Amino acid sequence: MAEPDLLAPFADLPFPPGDDFPDFPTLGDDAFALEDFDLDDLDFDFDVDLFPPDAPPPVTTSSSSSAAGSPEAGTSSAGDGGSKNEESADSSSPSRSGSDGGGGKDGKDDEAKRRARLVRNRESAHQSRQRKKQYVEELEGKVKVMQATIADLTARISCVTAENAALKQQLGGAAGAGAAAPPPPMPMYPAVYPLPMPWIHPAYAMRGSQVPLVPIPRLKTQQPASTPEPPAKKARKTKKVAGVSLLGLLFLMMVCGCLVPAVNRMYGAAYTGEGAAIVPSHHGRILAVEGPQNSVSNGVDPKVPQNGSETLPALLYLPRNGKHVKINGNLVIKSIVASEKASSRLSNYGEKGSGNQGKEETSLAIPGYVAPLEAGEVMDSAKGMNELMALAPGDGSIYREDDGMLPQWFSEAMSGPMLNSGMCTEVFQFDLSPTTADANGIVPVYSGSVTNTSQNYTENLPSGPVQKVKNRRISYSEAIPLRGSTSNDTDHFKAPPKNHSQSHAGRKPVSSVVVSVLADPREASDRDGEGRISSNSLSRIFVVVLIDSVKYVTYSCVLPFKSHSPHL
């Protein structure tokens, strides 16, 4: 059937003129494309009222909904006009034949169906156009995003290319074996591709780009080969190290030289001219005192190895006439030893000449009761007496070597020793040996009557020459330290000199040590709460001496009176 025959029954319908419809190409035409389609070409007038006032609303079918939901319906909406005409022609042909045969009622129903079909077609075309328009907008947005991404990637590729060229230049310069590498060339377009930032991701692998799909590992930094140093620098370093070592050694020697004397003073042996030394022991420190050395024979070597630790003179400050008088304990011992030595010599001469040898056994000999001697004997006995005393009589300017430099106040305005044989008197003895005559070991000096002392002396005289005297008289003028100690040059006293008398041959040397110096309790009664001696003047002191480590002897010494020379 020809196309004009199909459209003939619809000639009486009120369609718009044909010039208003656009020319749509067929579905099989290759000239149809998205660029040739324009939504403005579809111009329909929806103001025409196609429904009668009493007509029911049209019912949408599944075909219209399926056409609205499928994207192919939008693409094929251009050919909806031809299909609609064909459908209307197919449906109108039986209705027309029916109307011709049946009557006018069937013609009204066909007209209503035709109008409903047209409305559905127009709604489907409108929805198709809306979907196409939305799809085109989405495509345009994607194109814009892709263009921005392409521009960004192009800039990154340019930066990577410039960085690659710079790295190649640096590698070429480093391979020149020490040759100065030229500076890297400036990029051709610095404003177009700036230097890459550390947070920029690597370039995307795009089709046709020079970026490899597999990442290239980083090249290891090649350090230039270190040239060997000349030997001159090594020699300088060696000299510098040797100099520093020498300075350190000198500094160490200086420090040791400063510390060793201090350590010796603290823990080692030290001596002074006063003749006192400290002997360290596990029980404490013992003060040993040396006596005069003039009685030692020249054949004995006076220089004996010394092993004392510290010089500690026995000093005591006592109030006297409103001043503090310094008492040297060494002088006390030397004075007592000198007086005993002198009295021992005088008593020996007295035994030979007069036969009056009586004297108390434990008393301190005072040269007042000695029998008169001949002139020659007196000269021999008085020879060297000044050397045995602590200070020789005279103007006070003579000093002995073993006494050392005494204080100035000690020798000013004094013509004799401060403590001589007439100033110190033995009070009592305390013997530690268990074979003492007394039960308590105390031997008083004045145990017998004073009136008949001379008779007792004469009655107790020995018949022959005295070989060993049972008293505390010593045979040597120098003090001997305690047993087991050799700190005061006393080893040479183990063999007595030959020039001594036979009466002294069997005697053993004894040691005298000052134990304490006490004040008279009757004069020092005014004391404070701490037991200190008051500043009042004292006229008498008591000196306790340990003899031979077995006997304590207490002496009462009278202090000299006030002189015109100030003390201390």
Curated annotation (Swiss-Prot):
Keyword Glycoprotein tagged: yes
Start and end residues of each stretch annotated as Leucine-zipper? 150-157
Q: What induces it?
A: By dithiothreitol- and tunicamycin-induced endoplasmic reticulum (ER) stress response.
User: Where do the bZIP domain residues begin and end?
Assistant: 111-171
According to the record, the segments passing through the membrane are 241-261
**Gene Ontology annotations of biological process type:** response to endoplasmic reticulum stress; response to unfolded protein
Query: What is the protein name given in its UniProt record?
Result: bZIP transcription factor 60
Biological source species: Oryza sativa subsp. japonica (Rice)
